[in-house]
Amino acid sequence: MVGWLSMPEAMITYRGVVYPWHCDHMGHMNVMWYVGKFDEATWQILAAVGASPSRMRTEGFGLVAVEQHIEYKRELRAGDLLTIRSSVLEAWEKSVRFVHQMTNEESGELAAKTVVTGVCIDISARKARALPHDIFRRIASLNE
């Protein structure tokens, strides 16, 4: 199966707060924490399409990030509540592209956005392989 898919509605994949230790010398959340929170959101969307960590371990496959582009839009400060909403932008036989949007829950402002491309690999062979068919079908069903 090869194809382009889009998911029109985003799902909530992360809710959290900015703690003081997330902030740098300028008083806003440091970039390392954006990446970490986006990574947590990725695990949630993967699980939603059937690619849970336990399944990956059991079946010997994984999804590895091969590209990530981040846009920082608004600062987040200690105490800010945030939500990440995620969608699948595209999926092909061996790869998938997600978008995550991080918003300040109180103001509703977009704080950051990232697009991540992941490739499915065979853990033992360390080579790209096809996404399991049921996962590809679940991604497709999100668009229905």
Regions found by a protein language model. Give the residues of each.
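Terminal targeting signals and extreme-terminal segments of soluble enzymes
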Residues: V2-T83, L89-E144
